[in-house]
Amino acid sequence: LVVHAESDLRSEDLPPGKQSHKLYSHVCMYTRTTGIWQTVWMEAVNPCGLERVQVFTDIDQNQIVVTPTFYKLSNGNRLAISVKDGGKVVAKSDVVAAQGIPVVMPIKKPKLWSPESPFLYDVVYEVKDAAGNVLDKVDAYVGMRKIHIDGTQIYLNNKPYYQRLVLDQGFYPDGVWTAPSDAALKGDIEMSMAAGFNGARLHQKVFEERFYYWADKLGYLVWGEMASWGKNSSSVAAARNFISEWTNIVVRDRNHPALVTWTPFNEEWEATTNEMGRFLTDVYELTRKLDPSRPVNTVSGGLYVISDFCTTHSYQQDGEKLHKMLFDGEKFYQPQAPGKINANTLDHLYYDGKVPYIIDEFGGIKCAEANPSKENAWGYGDAAITKEDFYKRLESQVKAIVSHSDKICGFCYTQLTDVEQEQNGVYYFDRTAKYD
């Protein structure tokens, strides 16, 4: 088997995210990734095997709903499902194997998944023929939890839940987009949690699914995001590629309990044509149809056309100014361009105070003491001189945001680690400690 993998960043038909289109990395664009960079494998599967399942957990009705898809069907085949708490079977079902027919499994006194208690049930799927022979067996897991919006709050398991996120771009010094080991994926989550974050906005990269596994196991909230930068939004081919790839991403990752938000786009500002507004709307509607169980943040910090909640980016370094900027009378800070996209097209929406509001990029502080000046090294605003200056600035910014906790239901700090010349991480690029 020979695989030829090619990705031409210059075509703009494939979204490269933050891979630099220049020879070298610059500003917030980094070293390009070549070849197959995520885990791939070959597996022998029975022709009537289980291709995938979509799992919906309903904590209000105390049940799990499993919708199976098979490679193909054969008369007499059945699907057996067992849900286990340790070695104890808490629910089981044996049904005729049928494409896309939901299987409802009641769970008595369910144990819920949350960051504080990331409980996972083991699940065993078995496809059997008419004689009872097992054709295919899949071991999996499920976390019972609910994420929903009510008014201006985002709820986890029917309780308002404040999200303290960090921006994670998933770059590594040696493998670029490829983590050096499974332990490294787990370690990124553990060091984020050690710094006080309860989750991450996974930024401009489709993360290895193993990362989601560790997030599920450790109780770490994540936002899934497409590598949307660099596409040509006026290209039909680019739009088709985006929709095709985004569909695959949502279908692959939608069963992970740790994943609580979809973010297909980052900072879209192309507000000059109605086509962009329609594209954003189409992707939003597609995402909601593929996965109605999670909110969609259509564009992080950019053009606000249609979304389940509003997000903004602000790198104002002065905490007092940030406080005044965020909430002035009845108007929240919104960096989007005012007015309409243009006459005769979509109205440009403003935050109306009726949906959740999150500052999903702020901070980005470089510290001169922690990162001595190097050519092209940067952070947002003027660098903090000492680590103590960094602590004070960080504290003032966080206080500015959380002081509006009745209006703002979460934040995302930029960023978890330094990435090449962007040296504003909580940790160094090699994952060693930078601060107390």
Regions found by a protein language model. Name each.
Residues 279, 310-312:
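Polar, glycine-rich mid-to-C-terminal structural blocks
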Residues 222-224, 298, 359:
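Hydrophobic residues in well-ordered beta-strands that form the structural core
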Residues 246-275:
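Active-site groove signature of glycoside hydrolases
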Residues 6, 227, 265-269, 292, ...:
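Catalytic metal-binding/acid-base residues of hydrolase active sites
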